[in-house]
A protein has these predicted regions:
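Rossmann-like S-adenosyl-L-methionine
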Residues: 11, 39-174
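Short glycine-rich, basic-tinged beta-strand/loop micro-motifs
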Residues: 24-37
Length: 174
């Protein structure tokens, strides 16, 4: 993806006004978050759309802070997700929210942490800096009651949504 992305950026008329491009990898789709310092020229918008179609990625434009990122195409408005099948979890996230960059390492990390923690039904456990619910929901799946603590209100909302979507809302609080 790096080489095609480099080629794309090299032909964009607005390239000097694009300070960064972030990559977010999901199980069903990948996304590029393009930081834009000024509105893109129509030919650049078309080049980005063509790139998205050719490479099967979603393009988000971010004119300000992370909360301003929005999909270029309406069809891309659904959230990205990753799965933790060993815990029967599907975790939704937006491309600007923190997730572990390597899904295999994330799965291993959660498995090992839970093996060491060995949560039991009825236990009460706190997950500090819970983010989108990566560890919180895996712990809750064990039968423990979990308090997820997070400094970002947007991530708290996301974690609560993930708890609900995974049928764990009664076992967690944020």
């Amino acid at each position: 993806m790096i080489r095609p992305l480099r080629n794309l950026v090299s032909v964009l008329a607005s390239r000097s006004r694009l300070p960064q491009i972030e990559v977010a990898l999901g199980a069903g789709a990948d996304a590029l978050v393009v930081r834009v310092l000024e509105p893109l020229l129509p030919p650049d918008v078309e080049l980005l759309r063509e790139f998205a179609a050719r490479h099967g990625v979603r393009i988000y434009l971010q004119p300000g802070g992370p909360e301003t990122a929005s999909p270029m195409l309406e069809a891309d408005e659904t959230d990205l997700y990753y799965a933790l099948p060993e815990f029967d979890l599907r975790i939704q996230f937006s491309p600007t929210e923190f997730t572990q960059v390597n899904p295999a390492v994330n799965s291993l990390l959660v498995r090992r942490a839970l093996a060491l923690l060995d949560p039991q039904p009825g236990e009460r456990i706190a997950d500090m800096f819970c983010g989108v619910g990566n560890f919180t929901l895996a712990i809750a799946r064990s039968g423990a009651t979990v308090l997820g603590v997070e400094g970002s209100e947007a991530l708290v909302r996301r974690a609560a949504l993930n708890a609900e979507l995974n049928g764990l809302a009664a076992s967690v609080s944020f």
